[in-house]
Amino acid sequence: MPIRRVKARSSGIRQTVIIDYKKVLTTSTPEKSLVVSLKKHSGRNNNGKITVRHHGGGYKKKYRIIDFKRDKINKVATVKSIEYDPNRTSFISLVVYEDGEKRYIIAPKDLKIGDRILSSNKQIDIKVGNALPISLIPEGTFVHNIELYPGRGGQMIRSAGSSAQILGKDETGEYTIVKLSSGEVRKIANGCMATIGVVSNEDHNLVVIGKAGTNRHRGIRPTVRGSAMNPNDHPHGGGEGRSPVGHDAPRTPWGKRHMGVKTRNKKKQSNALIIRRKK
């Protein structure tokens, strides 16, 4: 993936590292039939109160409707373009099926214009872009866009550069064991679909935004340190000068422990499917 380090013509771009999209993307115009408008809420609820901090502003962007289900079975599709999607870190591909229907999918690494891909509930070629039930994929294969429940659509392994590896079947034969990019090992029901390959834009983690204005363009507002606030605004606030937080552990603005606390629900049914937690 081409990475470009911007020349230091000003302080704002001195350390900037960006993806050279011109060498990767094939078009800058999305398919109109697969684009819808989004209304911004700036982190507010229906009462106008802030429920998510640090959201607001940013450039206008339209949502691309992505086919996460890959449920057009046994219909060959041809890749027409590799495009940028402002709503996710990976690239997307426009594919056209035999009957003329157009859909967007998450673009895997090494997928090229003109490639023909297929979704099936039977055994097909294990090649990049093909989607099939996870039980039919051989051990050692890297996959993405994995369903957690059959027919619900891919919910895991969708961000740039991510992938999961098939490790084999469990002792009952009802589940397939996969290793996620986080290191977690878990069971996936055999009927769940997965797509072959690694998600595109694998160098996304090397990007350096360079200046605060880039985050403002993305709709991310500044984060104020709790220690810089007053004591009625934050548990870390108050004191003379640079005072310590005054607690046995860092706290959230609402007084809860902030670091090293597990947030997963202990009663979640899917806990039984996790063989080894992430590292």
Curated annotation (Swiss-Prot):
Compositional bias of kind Basic residues: 254-279
Keywords: Ribonucleoprotein, Ribosomal protein, RNA-binding, rRNA-binding
Record has Flavoprotein as a keyword: no
InterPro entries named in the record: NA-bd_OB-fold, Rib_uL2_dom2, Ribosomal_uL2, Ribosomal_uL2_bac/org-type, Ribosomal_uL2_C, Ribosomal_uL2_CS, Ribosomal_uL2_dom3, Ribosomal_uL2_RNA-bd_dom
Region entry Disordered, spans: 217-279
Function: One of the primary rRNA binding proteins. Required for association of the 30S and 50S subunits to form the 70S ribosome, for tRNA binding and peptide bond formation. It has been suggested to have peptidyltransferase activity; this is somewhat controversial. Makes several contacts with the 16S rRNA in the 70S ribosome.
Family: Belongs to the universal ribosomal protein uL2 family.
Name recorded for this polypeptide: Large ribosomal subunit protein uL2
Protein's organism: Malacoplasma penetrans (strain HF-2)
Lineage: Bacteria, Bacillati, Mycoplasmatota, Mycoplasmoidales, Mycoplasmoidaceae
Gene: rplB
